[in-house]
Amino acid sequence: MTKPIVAIVGRPNVGKSTIFNRIVGERVSIVEDTPGVTRDRIYSSGEWLTHDFNIIDTGGIEIGDAPFQTQIRAQAEIAIDEAYVIIFMVNVREGLTQSDEMVAQILYKSKKPVVLAVNKVDNMEMRTDVYDFYSLGFGEPYPISGSHGLGLGDLLDAVVSHFGEEEEDPYDEDTIRLSIIGRPNVGKSSLVNAILGEDRVIVSNVAGTTRDAIDTEYSYDGQDYVLIDTAGMRKKGKVYESTEKYSVLRALKAIERSNVVLVVIDAEQGIIEQDKRVAGYAHEQGKAVVIVVNKWDTVEKDSKTMKKFEDEVRKEFQFLDYAQIAFVSAKERTRLRTLFPYINEASENHKKRVQSSTLNEVVTGAISMNPTPTDKGRRLNVFYATQVAIEPPTFVVFVNDVELMHFSYKRYLENQIRAAFGFEGTPIHIIARKRN
């Protein structure tokens, strides 16, 4: 299921980033009393009562030719376009301004639900000034204090009241849901078209659960797939060309709905920092991953070229050490058949379950080969392990003291579990828990 999206919008220096950090529970946005500090959209997730949602902090929109204002406004308008609900923030201390009214005009045109938050209401005496903002036309203003955390409960109650009921997944559980991500110009749309032209049977174009996303269903060699949000990959236009301006949020939503994510990189240009950042979105969400090296036809080769490039990928994407690597040319439609076995295996392993008895045999054997660590005379005791979830496979290891389970030993156990059961293509999570 895709989570509802909440965008925080307003002019500069009204406290958007402070409220964002309050909602997500950690300091993700930079907070300074300088207009324009948050130029790009910042993404995170939040929860309130029984509702999970994604939230975006945007840069401040203002009148005039301030530095980066064109970029900031474009970013904010994209966030508004993608949001289910908008928190429109104003500042009680400065009162209603022309910039507030300009932001209001943008929000009227969006026709989205808007919750008006009046920030910096730090005491009861200031509440009377809140009513000046009724003139903006968004109903009752919610007085809040970002610095003190006051009023956030009422504000979030109003926000989640606009969330609709969760939509049912329209696809069979055996259907593999694929998303294709990568920085601009690595050939994502070309890969989509190449895949759809490779011995495929297009069943239909159906509306996805994300607003205005188009998912494409197809079959290959007896397996059903759905390519998530093919419209998003093909969308063009001066604002939408840039990953930083449009497709980051769209990619996050597509990843969220996927089983398997194809991370596309450009063989001709090599790996850059942005590739790792984009791939990190899939890893953080615990999705199965296949790394696709596209434009392989453009590389001069000898017998060692592929191995050298694979070594470089492994070095740069160490956090994706479980992912298999496919070398393809979408333009020439070559080597595409190598993709599907990797996709299928990654999907199967993402859903794999291991019997507790077999798992504990492996864990016991691992401990006998490499005894558990000690700290200040205390040894880590591992009592037993069990698998508690799939997608991704998640294991709980019951121990005498969680603090004694160092990262290095947890990694060792993960490697032993992988050696025994495979799990190619998928992350696995190991959680240490104290036995009662």
From Swiss-Prot:
* Entry annotated with the keyword Nucleotide-binding: yes
User: Residues in domain EngA-type G?
Assistant: 4-167, 176-351
UniProt GO BP:
ribosome biogenesis
Concerning InterPro entries, the annotation shows: G_ENGA, GTP-bd, GTPase_Der, KH_dom-like, KH_dom-like_a/b, P-loop_NTPase, Small_GTP-bd
Q: Which domain of life is it from?
A: Bacteria
Keywords noted in UniProt = GTP-binding, Nucleotide-binding, Repeat, Ribosome biogenesis
Q: Which residues form the KH-like domain?
A: 352-436
Record's PROSITE patterns?
G_ENGA (PS51712)
* Molecular function per GO: GTP binding; ribosome binding
Residues recorded as binding GTP 1, renumbered to this chain, are 10-17, 57-61, 119-122
Q: Record's Pfam families?
A: KH_dom-like (PF14714), MMR_HSR1 (PF01926)
Q: Which protein family is named in the record? A: Belongs to the TRAFAC class TrmE-Era-EngA-EngB-Septin-like GTPase superfamily. EngA (Der) GTPase family.
Job of this protein: GTPase that plays an essential role in the late steps of ribosome biogenesis.
Give the protein's recorded name.
Answer: GTPase Der
Which gene produces this protein?
A: der
